[in-house]
Amino acid sequence: MWVWKKHIAAEHEEEWQERLAEFPWAVISALPHAKRLLVEVYDEAPGKLLALYSCYGGDCSPVEEKDWVAATAPENTPPLIIRDRLVISADASEAKINELQARYPGRIVLSFPAERAFGTGNHATTSTCLRMLCDEAKKLAPGQWRLIDAGCGTGVLGLAGMRLGAQSGICYDFDPIAVEVAERNLQRNGGAENLRLFQADVFEWSPKPEEKAHILLANLFSTVLQRAFPRLKACLAEPESVLIVSGILREQAEETLAAANRHGFELLRRVTAGKWVTMKLRQRS
């Protein structure tokens, strides 16, 4: 086993995620008390890693023998750092969460272990949605906005939104297993008293007027999104409300954006992470 390592500026994290999308064993992690991030890419052979070294510098070396099963266990998996607001751990132990809270004072620490539902935070679609959610929440007064997470999976986006200042929120998923997993995650983390969770179909459910969202997240398949834009539009509280959509393969991005445009949305931001695209949309004025 070989590893290539390089320190990068935090503001370049997204472009490095895209650059390293072909490497299944690529990890970007924050170091305690450091302003820069550490990129590590592992491979059985040095060839591709030496190519990275040739292009970008850093360090390439063989890895000492160790128990890789233990090394990749949840308690040894680096937490996901989202902006300066969120820390998401795959570990469910109270001791680990307390340790992370001490290591990252002032940040919101959440526990989302891998289960049968999608969305622990590490997938490019979920992590990009989380970054956009953090950015949008900063613009809104705490306790003065509402959130909807359509196709919530584990519930990570909805709970993050509540912790970031939403007054109330709604999470729903078509998959009953996802709803079960999300319920466990909300109970473990707390802070979801004003977050309503239930099973529903994006093509059938509609919010009451007082439930409509200022931030609406929909991390769904692009084919579902293209059909769901009219329903999603009806979930927005006001023309300035933001719709964040993901789950879009890069080759399906243009047709998905065209569908959004047909239903009155304009593109505010687009982020590509590997083969996945996330978009921030708003109703055209």
Sequence positions of predicted segments:
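A short helix-to-beta-strand connector/capping loop
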Residues: 56, 84, 105-106, 167, ...
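N-terminal auxiliary segments of SAM/dcSAM-dependent transferases
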Residues: 1-101
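SAM-dependent Rossmann-like transferase core, predominantly class I methyltransferases
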Residues: 69-141
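Conserved SAM/SAH cofactor-binding pocket of Class I
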Residues: 116, 122-204
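Active-site-adjacent beta-strand anchor residues
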Residues: 6, 111, 119, 172, ...
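S-adenosylmethionine
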Residues: 174-285
